[in-house]
Amino acid sequence: MNSLQEKFNKKNTKILIIVFICLFILDIFLWFGILKENEKLEMDFLDVGQGDATLIKFPFSGEILIDSGDGQQIKTALSSVKNYFNRHIDVWILSHANLDHYGGFLKLIETNPPQIFIYNGFDSEGTTFLLLKKLLKEKNIPLVTLYQGDKIKIGDSYFSILWPPKNKEIKDLNDSSLILRLVDKKHSALFLGDASTKISDNLINQQSEILKMSHHGSKTATSEEIIRLIKPSIALIGVGLNNSFHHPHDEVINLLKKFDVKIFRTDLNGTIKIIFDDKILIKEKK
């Protein structure tokens, strides 16, 4: 009897030791993963099909999601770049109220709501956008409206809001897009939403290495003047494979090639990770 009890106790002790070791190793991996992803500013230009979504992770200062696609692929896209045990995103920014930019927020709000929601103050008459605002209000999430001249400071980095001006009447939702310039030490990125070429005058002295192309590479949203003003070395295009709009348009691709701009598009490259190091580092997920 004693012999059986000793064997049983030894077996249980071994199991407990193994469980303890596994938990200890898991704990190390979790903490290593959380700390590692906060060392430098990282920007994930997410593959969400025919839409835009960019996750920005600031060093020790939280995360911001700019746009979220139409909702069909946002959870899958985020799961490929975020720690499984940390799904929270601090701030959501909506460039403008088109479904292919805000639809994903509806998929995330029930399980992972933000602390703040930032947008341009221009509402869509669509019922889905009204639903998003209703859910934000129900969860007591502040809706903050930003305009030209405003700034968002996060640690050593900041966003400048270049468009739209306050109290300006804009009929086209695309042209109401929040235009944001992210600056981190010696690197910068410009986000144009879906704004058309009409806004080019507002981009003087806004040179940026990285350009999030407007309106998925549409020829109505890019001109030679804009490329000359911004002088990008990298262009990001959020676009669905074989989309019915034929984005990006050949004219835009040829223009970028003319200026030796490196082109990354989600339909061909998948999610694109950009790390703001001494130099810009780029990793493709596909």
Label each residue range with its predicted role.
Residues N2-K286:
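Non-globular, low-confidence helical/coil segments that flank catalytic cores
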